[in-house]
UniProtKB/Swiss-Prot annotation:
Residues 562-577, 1395-1427 have a biased composition (Basic and acidic residues). InterPro entries: DEAD/DEAH_box_helicase_dom (IPR011545), Helicase_ATP-bd (IPR014001), Helicase_C-like (IPR001650), P-loop_NTPase (IPR027417), SKI2_subfamily_helicases (IPR052431). It is found in: Nucleus. Residues 1198-1379 form the Helicase C-terminal domain. This is Uncharacterized helicase DDB_G0278827. Residues 338-357, 562-605, 1388-1487 are annotated as: Disordered. Residues 339-357, 581-603, 1456-1487 have a biased composition (Low complexity). Belongs to the helicase family. SKI2 subfamily.
Length: 1816
């Protein structure tokens, strides 16, 4: 196989995506597949995935294999996946064992399969969300069994190990793994690699691979017959060899399977197996193996934690011995399995050998490290007699070893000599190692490990102690006694009071609304800017709302006090009136007289009446004249469907009905006669006789039946009658007299009977108006398919079903009647309560936001409501909506000039009225900035409501943590809106738990106002080369999606709904397949029998009940065969496995087909930005080419030549010509004619050139707009996007190709949502959001969802799956903690408003005081400890509970300032050491008595919100874990000199950290480079200086790694390596970080007692419970191991300090992130994202940022650097902002320093280059 030359590599056939969270993109509830062999190989090669510079190559080693350690990692991995609430299967292919190259791995694999798959226990993991499967398949020959398995289970992806490491080739056949991946990709769309997998909090992150463009062409290079033959030959050879060895082994050792079990049966067998075929090896190894078996059984797992130095070289003979032992054990276990299978098949249960029982599988089967330890002791001490051997291992150990040895000799009859042959031992020396050096190294390493300092630095103040009391108390015993001293270098307190983009200081009252003196100076300039901004949104706003409905607020609602005064005033007035009855009566009389006089003088009323009467007469004459001209059904219905004139001109309506009936009767008669004549004429011509030919009565009836109205016309007549009946009966309007109603009823009866053919409707009309006409039955209405009106409504008139949503009039809402659930929401807002609202898209949930806005605007001028959007597009839309709905006149309300603004916007690139607005529209990242800003006291206190739109974004792997932090940190009432929440109850409970004193209601409304119809596009291939493929849009019945499995059916999802037509179709299939008797109760006539007026007035709610009953009946069917019959009958024959095709090349024809079917306007969703743009361009080009006349092209050329010659002939005289000059006019005429030739009428829409904004016309996609085609994605210009949204809403364009940017809340109503092709980003959540854009309320009766080019299985999963559960996030990080501490420090010390200069003076004074205080330091420390103890008591009593009320917080804060001797630090720092903690008399916190009430309230809010943040993680159930993360972050900040010992924030580049917090961890890395002096000696040449800075930053920010598929391309530009000094600084920073975090992790694991969970699932299945002990060695191990433990005490780490996994693996010192991730454990959820760890040793980094600065060209970045065009603007813009932030922070610290000047210069120049290349 390896000799086959491959021209391609695996990466050429698959394309990788960026690393992202597979759970959020595929969906946590989507089942996926794990390749079991890949998992085994991954665990044995995981460290090879890390940097090649890491010394520890592997996590697990076959040479030093410990099987129990493998299963620890194996089960921990499974537990980690399960803890993310996933569903998956792990499968093994039995035949793959022969492709392993290592016998130990084969043995591990065998144990794994026996334990987890062949175990007699059912599901040993006791978890239904994971299943193990073993498949027997020679898949290279026949893939059908695996294909069936994949198709049956519909896995979303497979997790597999790519053969990218050397260790893989060492263990497994690389080429076979590659072929297996490709074969699997034939039936799976995506594979996910093990190589990059990482558990980050609630996320599982890795790289996803899809099929590349070369997949189909390259597949044969890998998967060819010749190659498969070689695989088969290799397999057969390995299989035969193994089978031969197995049979030989069985023949020679039949006694193994027949002997009765002895006391030490397991060990005897193991020893026998190991010794049997090793005669050529020294018998010493057999004896050592015997001792090893006894110790393996006797020692606890924790007592086997030896350190085996990497310098120890294992003898080749030993390796062969152990490898051979593994192989013989594999043969033995295989024989046991075969025997068990044979016994089971023969029902023979007489086998007494427990080893044959798969329940007793021993996971602790191998421990080669223990064997090497025994070997080393034997070889170094060379025992000469039994006493010496006993002194090494203990007498009891040797006795047991001899017993096993002798039993083997006796029981099995093998002559293996004597055990105590000490001549062999004494001559057994190690010639590869200096064993004394090895022992010394082991002792040194053990001593070093046991002396690891696990102490921590508890940086504390009142804030820290109060927000994390539990963790603080638990960490106290581990607190370091000696905090490091350092030289003073930092003497300035950090105050984050400036904007990230400007050095301008933020005023303390920035968020208070006051009219400042500077307002008058800057008002005009500022107003002009704001007017310009508002003006740009005017057209956008008008497309969202009718500008005539704008609400102008000129006054505020009265306050409670004002209402009370008004009530008292009214009571006084009423009491005065009661004493003046006479005057009151005379007044009443006078009023009556006046009224009479007034009424008699209203002359205009009669004139209006005459005018109305005149118009009515004109209308009557016009309609009467039109009646005579009516020649079609459409013309009759146009008048009859309009009931506006019914009360005024009922006779005219009756005339129209009569004419309509007569018209149809005559039309039918004429058609019958014409058809008769035609038939008779044909027969005459065919007949040769002249006899008279007549039609039979049957033939005449057939002709009459064939000429009945079509179903479309019948539906129109039915809906017309339905409208009249509802007006006359259900609406109970007394608009017509009874006589007139009877006249109308007679016409209705005739139409229902003769035209529509519904007997029950005719009988209803007859009975209701007592017409006394004959009762009809089905035979009286002709040969009709439908004979009752109920089925007719369901099947042919579902659009007119009553949509009764419980709407009622409510004075609080303008312009519409709110539904019942919306009224409940109004009440919640009026009470200032919170709510979680989950309602389907287009149901109208956003209305509550506008009610909230209106209430706040009317209530006061100071209150703020914040609207949080997930995207900037939604921010723009909401801003425009507010502008279009409201206007508030603050000057009229205040009676003076005002600084207030109604609405503001805050995004990273657009800021407007943030400080002065009442409605703030923002994104979550910017709201967090406001929450954490030290200047936001007034802002938070003014917040009345916060509205979180699309709150399911909390599940996002990108910014989900920010959403969660905002929800937890928010102190105000809130509304959380979403249409797609899976675990709704869990999420609601989480929101309630945040603040138990805050009521959070749940509003769950599942119904859609407009239902969705599902379709799929079917391609019919071309018949020959001359023809083209055709496309049909076929309806997709929801029940067809149940056919997900090849051999079965899936269950019905709760979200699967049937609309009316689908419900009646299902009933008819059930009746046909099962018989009417079984389903008669589901007969619509019977089911709806008790519904009043059912013949014309069914409601949508009735259908929902009916479809639920149908689904329940189907679910309860006992027979799978019956279910399959039903599903098959409801499935279109075209809905098969051939739905995937090359749709992109046919996109124009597809769009035209939708236009033909009247399915436009439509949103075409594709989740690739570049593809969206290309599709829009392609359709535009095709349409332009098709609609352009070739003759016009020639005419254009001729006209261009004429114009050019004409202009040349005029020459310079042209400029002097008058406008009315004939020559000038002729030239203008020619130009106008030329311009007219360029105009093409839009194919999709109706827009003019003026509809396209001037700013947009230069956009590359602008020409496509002229044909009604657009693209919409995050890479587009914002002006273009805004224009597209406006044009689409206005129906001026009808085709938009979009990513999910239009799926999240943007108002883009469409008739259809079209999914183009598959994508890993297309999951259930995304599909529901995208589909919800179709059929918006008030626009369409139905929404259409069309699937194009998606596999059937994917469509099934999207339509018949429940929404994924929200998992949650890790919410704490060092950057966040620094912001929290900075804000607290400013709130408690900001009342003095000290500037930085004042702080510097204060610190210098403190330094002078320090010398005087040194003598008193010890006494103060004692005093401090005493007070801290008092604090601890208080914490125990008060702080443990999460739900503290506001009063408790206030008392607690006030008390703390009285009792705690808070001190300010005299900070002393160096590069890598924390601040000194010497104290002075100067207080660090100001007494609350000295603070303002606003500052006190701010402190209370901050503490309460931070407590909530640390105690209410949606993902982490245990709040202590979050508190540990918080205190670790504080410790880290102290060690890195961002905080002092008393938790005072220091200005040590802290501004860069906080303002670049969203780029964590690289904000900290950059600061470490600054402090390390990387930029101290910059090149003097400006260009070289700029290149150096950008080179360094390109490794940290906006990094684009180069996938392996591109590395081979010479056109890719790779960044040069970082300088060694940079590497060293980063490494030192990483080492300090990991050391600190390891300590906290160690303490937390100690708290969890995690050694009990060494095997998360199988702890109780270990052979010896003693092996899981958590106490000390002397207390747990038996006496037989005392000697061993005594001799080896110096050679193994203390079991007290480390858990079992650490002891066995030898990972004691965490040197890299990969190691850290492997020791986290399955019961800890620490995300490594919270660590400011920077790894720059990974894959090559794209140099596009540096390249752009060098050549300033976009094209090379796209073509050479392979940066997507749609991403380029975003990346370069982001990098420009980063440069600006850094330059601002450095300039603020020291504007004249060379570093500040260098960064300011490069930032300015980079931004200029960016602006020159990008217009937007």
């Amino acid at each position: 196989m390896e000799n086959i030359e491959k021209k391609l590599m695996l990466g050429d056939l698959l394309f990788p995506t960026k690393t992202f969270n597979v759970l959020s993109d595929f969906g946590a509830d989507e089942p996926f597949l794990i390749d079991g062999d890949s998992l085994i190989l991954y665990l044995f090669s995981t460290f090879n995935i890390s940097s090649h510079k890491i010394k520890d190559k592997q996590l697990l080693s076959t040479d030093k294999c410990q099987s129990i350690l493998f299963f620890h990692y194996f089960e921990s991995f499974i537990a980690n996946v399960l803890n993310r609430k996933t569903k998956f299967q792990i499968f093994f292919i039995d035949e793959n064992q022969y492709f392993y190259k290592n016998n130990t791995l084969k043995l591990i694999r065998k144990i794994c399969i026996d334990y987890y798959i062949n175990n007699d226990k059912k599901n040993v993991l006791n978890n239904s969300n994971v299943q193990f499967t073993l498949i027997k398949s020679k898949w290279w020959e026949d893939f059908s069994s695996i294909e069936s398995y994949l198709l049956e289970n519909m896995f979303s992806f497979m997790l597999v190990l790519f053969p990218a490491q050397e260790s893989f080739e060492k263990y497994y056949r690389v080429d076979i793994q590659e072929v297996f991946i490709l074969k699997t990709m034939k039936f799976l769309d995506y594979v996910v690699e093990f190589n990059s997998i990482s558990f980050e909090g609630s996320c599982i992150e890795t790289i996803i691979y899809g099929k590349g463009t070369m997949f189909q062409r390259g597949y044969p290079y890998f998967c060819n017959k010749e190659f498969f033959k070689q695989i088969d030959s290799f397999y057969n050879n390995e299989f035969e060899n193994f089978n031969s060895d197995k049979l030989s082994f069985k023949d020679q050792n039949q006694i193994l399977f027949n002997q009765q079990q002895s006391e030490n049966r397991d060990n005897e067998i193991n020893l026998l197996i190991s010794t049997m075929f090793n005669n050529d090896i020294s018998n010493n190894l057999n004896r050592i193996y015997c001792i090893y078996l006894v110790l393996l059984e006797s020692l606890s797992i924790r007592d086997r934690g030896f350190i085996l130095p990497t310098c120890y070289k294992i003898d080749e003979n030993v390796l062969n011995f152990l490898d051979n032992a593994s192989y013989k054990n594999l043969l033995y276990l295989q024989q046991v399995s075969d025997s068990s299978s044979s016994s089971s098949n023969n029902n023979n249960n007489n086998n007494n050998n427990n080893n044959n029982n798969n329940e007793n599988i021993n996971l602790d089967y191998l421990d080669f490290k223990l064997f090497y330890q025994i070997l080393i002791q034997i070889q170094i001490k060379l025992p000469k007699d039994l006493n010496e051997l006993n002194n090494i291992f203990g007498e009891e150990i040797i006795i047991k070893s001899k017993l096993i040895w002798n039993n083997v000799k006796k029981d099995f009859g093998y002559d293996i000599g004597e055990f105590d042959n000490f001549e062999l031992f004494s001559n057994f020396q190690d010639r590869n190692n200096n064993l004394n050096d090895i022992i010394q190294e082991m002792e040194r390493r053990t001593k070093e490990i046991n002396s690891i300092d696990n102490s921590i630095y508890l940086v504390e103040n009142d804030f820290i102690r109060s927000v994390a009391p539990q963790a603080y108390e638990y960490l106290k015993p581990f607190q370091s006694e000696n905090y490091p001293d350092a030289e003073s270098t930092i003497n300035t307190r950090f105050i984050d009071n400036y904007h990230f983009h400007s050095t301008r200081t933020i005023e303390p009252d920035a968020f208070s609304i006051k009219l400042k003196e500077t307002t008058f100076k800057t008002k005009k300039h500022k107003q002009r800017a704001e007017d310009k901004s508002v003006g740009s949104f005017k057209k956008y706003a008008d497309s969202l709302n009718d500008p005539r409905n704008i609400l102008i607020i000129n006054k505020l609602n009265p306050t409670k006090e004002e209402l009370e005064k008004e009530r008292i005033k009214k009571e006084k007035e009423d009491s005065k009136k009661s004493y003046k009855k006479q005057s009151s009566s005379s007044s009443s009389s006078s009023t009556t007289t006046t009224s009479t006089t007034t009424s008699s003088t209203i002359k205009p009323k009669s004139e209006i009446g005459k005018l109305l009467e005149s118009r009515l007469n004109q209308d009557k004459k016009r309609y009467e004249s039109e009646l005579d001209d009516c020649k079609s059904i459409k013309s009759f219905l146009k008048f009859l469907n309009n009931l506006d004139l019914l009360t005024s001109l009922p006779e005219l309506y009756l005339q129209y009905f009569d004419h309509l009936i007569n018209f149809l009767v005559k039309q039918k008669e004429d058609l019958i006669e014409e058809k008769k004549r035609t038939i008779l004429l044909e027969r005459k011509q065919q007949s040769k006789t002249k006899t008279h030919i007549e039609l039979s009565e049957y033939e005449e009836k057939e002709i009459e039946t064939s000429l009945e109205l079509g179903i479309k016309e019948k539906s129109q007549f039915y809906q017309m009658i339905q409208k009249y009946l509802r007006s006359f009966i259900t609406e109970k309007s007394k608009i017509l007299s009874t006589k007139l109603q009877i006249d109308f009823a007679n016409r209705f009866y005739t139409i229902s009977k003769s035209l529509i053919g519904l007997s029950d409707l005719s009988n209803f009309i007859n009975d209701h108006w007592k017409l006394k006409l004959p009762k009809l039955d089905e035979s009286d209405v002709g040969n009709q398919q439908l004979k009752n009106s109920i089925e007719f409504q369901l099947k042919h008139s579902p659009d007119t079903l009553i949509r009764n949503t419980g709407s009622v009039e409510d004075s609080r809402v303008r312009h519409f009647k709110p539904d019942a659930w919306q009224v409940e929401l109004l009440d919640i807002v009026d009470k200032r309560e919170s709510a979680l609202i989950c309602a389907s898209t287009s149901s109208g949930k956003t209305f509550i936001s506008f009610y909230c806005f209106e209430q706040i605007l009317k209530e006061s001028n100071d209150g703020i409501v914040v609207f949080v959007c997930p995207t900037k597009a939604l921010v723009n839309q909401m801003y425009a909506e507010v502008l279009g709905r409201y206007d508030k006149n603050y000057q009229a309300i205040n009676h003076r000039p005002s600084n207030h603004k109604m609405v503001g916007v805050f995004t990273r690139d657009f800021r407007l009225n943030i400080e002065t607005c009442q409605i703030l529209i923002t994104v979550p990242q910017c709201l967090e900035i406001l929450f954490l800003s030290i200047m936001n006291t007034h802002f938070i206190q003014r917040c009345r409501y916060i509205i979180f739109d699309e709150v399911h974004q909390i599940a996002s792997s990108v910014d989900g943590a920010i959403w969660e932090r905002l929800l937890v940190f928010n102190p105000a009432p809130f509304l959380a809106l979403s249409a797609t929440l899976g675990n709704l109850t869990d999420f609601h409970n989480f929101l309630k738990k945040i603040d138990p004193n805050r009521k959070v209601s749940l509003i769950h409304y599942q119904s859609r106002f407009n239902d969705l119809k599902n379709f799929f596009l079917c391609q019919t291939p071309a018949k020959d080369n001359k023809s083209f493929p055709t496309y049909t849009i076929e309806p997709l019945h929801p029940m067809a999606t149940l056919d997900q499995k090849k051999t079965g059916l899936s269950d019905i999802s709760p979200d699967l709904k049937l609309i009316a037509g689908e419900a009646i179709q299902m009933y008819q299939v059930l009746k046909e397949k099962l018989g009417y008797e079984k389903v008669n109760h589901l007969d619509p006539v019977k089911f709806f029998a008790n519904i009043p007026n059912k013949q014309f007035n069914l409601e949508k709610q009735h259908i929902e009940i009916y479809q639920a009953e149908l689904k329940q009946f189907y679910t309860n069917l006992p027979s799978m065969t019956e279910k399959q019959l039903v599903v098959k009958a409801l499935t279109s024959p075209k809905y098969n496995d051939s739905l995937k095709f090359d749709w992109a090349s046919e996109i124009t024809n597809i769009v035209l087909e939708l236009q033909k079917q009247d399915l436009l306007p439509a949103l075409f969703f594709s989740f690739n930005r570049s593809l969206c743009s290309r599709l829009a361009q392609r359709v535009y080009n095709d349409i332009t080419h098709r609609n352009t006349n070739p003759n016009i092209i020639e005419e254009k050329k001729q006209l261009d030549l004429v114009i050019e010659r004409f202009q040349k002939s005029l020459g310079r005289a042209l400029a002097d010509l008058e406008p009315n000059d004939p020559e000038k006019m002729e030239l203008e005429r020619l130009k106008a004619k030329r311009a007219s030739l360029d105009y093409l009428k839009p194919q999709f829409g109706n827009l003019l050139s003026s509809d396209i904004d001037e700013k947009v016309k230069k956009d590359p996609l602008a020409p496509a707009l002229t044909q009604g085609i657009a693209a919409h994605h995050g890479g587009c210009d914002k002006n273009y996007l805004r224009n597209v949204e406006y044009l689409f809403r206005s129906k001026k364009i009808q085709v938009v190709f979009a990513t999910s940017t239009l799926a999240v809340g943007v108002n883009a109503p469409a008739k259809s949502s079209v999914f183009l092709g598959d994508s890993p980003y297309l999951n259930v959540l995304t599909s529901k959001q995208c589909a919800g854009r179709a059929g918006r309320r008030g626009f369409d009766n139905y929404g259409n969802v069309i699937f194009v080019g998606l596999p059937k299985q994917k469509i099934n999963r999207l339509l018949n799956s429940r929404l994924s559960n929200i998992i949650g996030n890790s919410v704490v990080s060092p950057s966040l903690c620094l912001s929290l501490v900075s804000r607290y420090d400013y709130s408690t010390n900001g009342s003095a408003n000290k500037s930085n200069e004042e702080n510097k003076v204060q610190v210098k004074e403190n330094e002078k005081e320090r010398e005087k205080e040194k003598e008193k330091e010890k006494e103060k420390e004692k005093e401090k400890e005493t007070i801290a103890d008092n604090w601890d008591d208080d914490d125990d009593k008060k702080e443990i509970t999460v739900a503290d009320n506001w009063d408790d917080d206030e008392e607690e804060t006030a008390e703390s300032t009285k009792t705690t001797p808070a001190t300010t630090p005299t900070t002393t720092t160096t590069e890598n050491t924390p601040a000194t903690t010497t104290t002075t008399k100067t207080p660090t916190t100001t007494s609350l008595k000295k603070l303002s009430s606003e500052d006190i309230l701010d402190v209370q809010i901050l503490k309460k919100s931070t407590k909530s943040l640390l105690n209410n993680s949606f993902f982490l159930g245990n709040p202590l874990q979050v508190q540990f993360q918080f205190l670790f972050s504080i410790d880290y900040l102290y060690r890195e000199t961002y905080l002092s010992k008393d938790c005072v924030p220091m200005d040590n580049f802290s501004g860069i950290v906080t303002h670049l917090s969203y780029l964590e961890p690289f904000n900290f890395t950059f600061v470490s480079l600054l402090k390390g002096g990387v930029f101290d000696n910059l090149p003097t040449n400006q260009k070289d200086c700029d290149y150096f800075i950008i080179h360094i930053l390109s490794y940290l920010f906006c990094v684009q790694n180069i996938p392996s598929i591109y590395v081979r391309s010479p056109s890719i530009l790779i960044l040069p390596p970082l300088p060694p000094t940079v590497h060293k600084i980063i490494k030192n920073h990483n080492d300090r970080l990991l050391k600190t975090f390891s300590t906290y992790l160690y303490v937390y694991k100690k708290y969890l007692k995690s050694t009990n969970d060494f095997l998360p699932f199988s702890s109780n299945d270990l052979k010896d419970s003693q092996k899981t002990t958590t106490t000390t060695t002397t207390a747990t191990t038996s006496t037989i191991t005392n000697k061993w433990n005594e001799n080896f005490e110096k050679l193994k780490p203390s079991t007290e300090n480390f858990n079992t996994g650490d002891l066995l693996s030898g990972i004691f010192k965490v040197s890299n992130l990969k190691k850290l991730k492997n020791i986290l454990g399955s019961n800890t959820y620490f995300s490594t994202r919270i660590l400011p760890y920077c790894n720059v040793d990974g894959s090559p980094v794209n140099s596009y940022l540096l390249d752009f600065y060098k050549h300033s060209q976009k094209k090379p970045l796209i073509e050479d650097n392979k940066i997507k065009e749609s991403d380029l603007w975003t990346l370069l813009k982001e990098f420009s902002l980063i440069l600006k932030v850094i330059a601002t922070a450095l300039t603020r610290r020291n504007p004249d320093s060379p570093i500040s000047l260098a960064f300011s210069g490069v930032a300015k120049r980079y931004i200029q280059k960016f602006s020159d290349n990008f217009d937007h």
